[in-house]
Amino acid sequence: TKDFVAALLKNTPVFENGGRAATTTFSQRNIGDVLVTFENEANYVSKKLTQDQFEIVYPSYTILSEAPVAVVDSVVDKKGTRSAAEAYLQNLWSEPAQELAANLYLRPRNAEVLAKHKADFPEIETFNPNEKFGPWEEIMKKFFADGGLFDQLSSKK
């Protein structure tokens, strides 16, 4: 698979600094043949930006990508926003919040909401990166640090 990834990187005309920038480059500047991105970005491009001009292809399995959410004591105490931050956190996984997430192309974690939107979110096998590759510190060092696997494979460009 290293050869496949090296070939993929070799054929990448632009390395953007973030997901939305890559989406814009692909969908509005028409640079590139394929956009490898998060599910919500793919749906955003297909449904909002280009009215289904692009086909979304799901891999047979993919990484479980979970965004961390936390109340940062020093920040909320300084700004006086603790109650709002805690209320947000408590309601984030509620059915209405998950419904809103689904409407914004984010895969709901609530099983009932996910079932309601199953046409938009096909079943896909996921894996936990920590179980497969170790702690984040090791993952970052191995794959993304200076001289790491990403640098090695992209230098073959």
What are these regions (language model features)?
Residues 74-157:
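Extracellular/periplasmic juxtamembrane helices and adjacent flexible linkers that interface
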Residues 1-59:
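Ligand-binding pocket segment of bilobal, Venus flytrap-like solute-binding proteins
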